């Protein structure tokens, strides 16, 4: 019996509470997995993306939020010629995109000890939140009063 791991289909989406286009996500899952990242749920409407970008400085990384997509790009500019006997720290250029659900916004980005952390918050407008509607009509007390008057 075969088992399929669908976790790559879910890991680049944040705040979605519904299924999305699996074909598009499957294509994204086959792409390069650099840099490694985590997506954490910090609360009901709070999320955090952490990317391991060791070897990059904050001015070599750009974070762009446009519509429902967060794009993180890194370009290492090594101006000095150095001779490495072994190079294990990757400094290649990268571009990583994350699709966000409606009303999820980037609140903050911070860089500390080689980790880029991007804080996200889902803020649903008041007009879009569910609300309870009062039903107007005859209550059972009013109905009994009307019946006793009729009798």
Swiss-Prot record:
<protein>
    <recommendedName>
        <fullName>Small heat shock protein HspD</fullName>
    </recommendedName>
</protein>
<keyword id="KW-0346">Stress response</keyword>
<comment type="similarity">
    <text>Belongs to the small heat shock protein (HSP20) family.</text>
</comment>
<feature type="domain" description="sHSP">
    <location>
        <begin position="28"/>
        <end position="138"/>
    </location>
</feature>
<dbReference type="GO" id="GO:0005737">
    <property type="term" value="C:cytoplasm"/>
</dbReference>
<dbReference type="InterPro" id="IPR008978">
    <property type="entry name" value="HSP20-like_chaperone"/>
</dbReference>
<dbReference type="Pfam" id="PF00011">
    <property type="entry name" value="HSP20"/>
</dbReference>
<dbReference type="InterPro" id="IPR002068">
    <property type="entry name" value="A-crystallin/Hsp20_dom"/>
</dbReference>
<dbReference type="InterPro" id="IPR037913">
    <property type="entry name" value="ACD_IbpA/B"/>
</dbReference>
